[in-house]
Amino acid sequence: MADESSDAAGEPQPAPAPVRRRSSANYRAYATEPHAKKKSKISASRKLQLKTLMLQIAKQEMEREAEERRGEKGRVLRTRCQPLELDGLGFEELQDLCRQLHARVDKVDEERYDVEAKVTKNITEIADLTQKIYDLRGKFKRPTLRRVRISADAMMQALLGTRAKESLDLRAHLKQVKKEDIEKENREVGDWRKNIDALSGMEGRKKKFEG
C-alpha cells in the first residue's frame, strides 16, 4: 500500500479541464439556435394613434408660438407708433412734428442697419467655425465635378507645364535627313558596278563585245 501511494504521489496528475463560463455558452447557443423575434408590446394601431397625437401637439405648439410672435409685434408697434394728435396744431407745430418723425425714422434705420451688420457677422463666423470643424474632422466638402473631354497633349500640358512640350517632341533630338540626300545615296548605290568597271579598265572591253 505504501508503494502504491508513493507511485501515485510521484506521477504528475492531469490538468483539470477548462470550465466554460455560462455567459459565453449561452451567447453561443443564442447565436446558433433559431429563436423567434420578440413581438412589440404596442400594436400598429396604437403606434399610429400616438403618432397622430404627437403631430397634433406639435401643430398646436407651432400655432401658439406664431400667435405669441404676432402679439409681440403688435405690442412693439403700439409702443413705437403711437397715434398722432393733429387737432389744433398750427403750421409751425406740424413742421416740428414732421421733423421729429423724420428723426425717429432715421434712428430706426440706423438700428436696423446695425442689427443686419451683426447678423451678417454672426453668419460669417458660424460658417468659418463650421468649416474649421470639417477641417479638423477631415471631412471636406467635395465640389460637384463634371466630365470634361481632354486630349493626351492637354493632359500632359496640365501635369508637366512647360516641360510637356519638350517631352512630347520626340523627334527634336533625331537627325534630320533631307530628301535630296536620300536620292543621292540611292543613285550612288545603284551605280556601284559602273564605278568598279571604270576603275578596273573593263568598261572599254565590254563595249567591244557588245558592239
From Swiss-Prot:
The modification Phosphoserine is found at S5, S6, S23, S24, S43, S45, S151, S167, S200. One of its GO terms (cellular component) is cytoplasm. Residues 33-80 are annotated as: Involved in binding TNC. It comes from Mus musculus. Phosphorylated at Ser-23 and Ser-24 by PRKD1; phosphorylation reduces myofilament calcium sensitivity. Phosphorylated preferentially at Thr-32. Phosphorylation by STK4/MST1 alters its binding affinity to TNNC1 (cardiac Tn-C) and TNNT2 (cardiac Tn-T). Phosphorylated at Ser-43 and Ser-45 by PRKCE; phosphorylation increases myocardium contractile dysfunction. Residues 130-151 are annotated as: Involved in binding TNC and actin. Troponin I is the inhibitory subunit of troponin, the thin filament regulatory complex which confers calcium-sensitivity to striated muscle actomyosin ATPase activity. Keywords: Acetylation, Actin-binding, Muscle protein, Phosphoprotein. This is Troponin I, cardiac muscle. The lineage of its organism: Eukaryota, Metazoa, Chordata, Craniata, Vertebrata. The modification N-acetylalanine is found at A2.
